[in-house]
Amino acid sequence: METIDMTSQEENFMRKIEADEKIEPKDWMPEAYRKNLIRQMSQHAHSEVIGMQPEGNWITRAPSLRRKAVLLSKVQDEAGHGLYLYSATETLGISRAELIAALQSGEAKYASIFNYPTLTWGDVGAIGWLVDGAAIVNQVSLQRTSYGPYSRGMIRICKEESFHQRQGYEALLALAKGSPEQKQMAQDSLNRFYWPALMMFGPHDSESAHSAKSMEWKIKRETNDDLRQKFIDQTVPQIEVLGLEHPDKEIKWNEERGHYDAGEIDWDEFYSVINGNGHCNRQRVEHHIAAHDEGTWVRDAITAYNEKKNAKKAQNVA
């Protein structure tokens, strides 16, 4: 069996990983570990920012002032989550400008579910309940990730995501307990967003290019399939409370496994969407580019102010 000689730096790095110690920005780390983190963390940040679009589209059309205020607060939270995660990613030696350029060029990915349109108010509830619910399952696990800034960011973000999930479920519950037309709207939203929510956990681990190494380095603490199973299990009783039909006609409790057996995901659809062929891929990125360009003057003004402030400070010191 071939043995791989490790340097003292690599040995110390792996010792920390195995001891569940956090890797901090100034610690030595393998370049592949750094790149893997940049890929995952930036994708997470991009998802928070792009995810504002399908919900923000409904702020002016929310059915009541209360719903509008809650949705506005939620979308603002998502912006904050993106900023936390961009800042955490920058500790790995990459600039915000580089991260945004990768998103806008299509080089970097974001959660595929945000390339589906929000056609009704029920979709806003489904996003809060299913999409943020899936995100919580993933992010609770990431609170134990090996990279310190990412772990600490997840602890704060999860507290806010739990509110997002509850507001989405409560909105859908109101529809499900309403008129026949409202209940049908809730059912339609569930049918359209359930399967894309399952896709959020990524491909089967056997087909994932990054899972094995991410697990070894404890960037990820649970596999894609294990996280997806948790989400499936918790969603079944929630659907029952709503009084809606489960979109997966093959869902069945497996006494031996202690989990629900589920139907197979349409992976052709998954890969088609992440490769840019979803309903809204082009629209989402174009909107981001337009908003970024419109904000250039703000960034320039802040830069000029800071330069002037620093120059004045240096002059006073001299």
Regions found by a protein language model. Name each.
Residues M1-E24, H46, E98-A108:
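Acidic, low-complexity proline/glycine-rich segments
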Residues T145-P196:
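Glycine- and acidic-residue-rich phosphate-binding/metal-coordinating active-site segment common to enzymes
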Residues E2-E11, A69, K74-A102, G168-L173:
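Conserved alpha-helical segments that form or flank metal/cofactor-binding pockets of metalloenzymes
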Residues K22-S42, A102-G128, T145, G178-Q182, ...:
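Acidic/His metal-coordination segments adjacent to aromatic residues that form catalytic metal sites
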Residues Y116-Q167:
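Internal, conserved structured core segments that host functional sites
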Residues Q184-A318:
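Extended, helix-rich structural scaffolds rather than catalytic motifs
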Residues Y33-H44, A62-H81, V124, P149-E161, ...:
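Alpha-helical scaffold segments that form or flank carboxylate-/histidine-based iron centers
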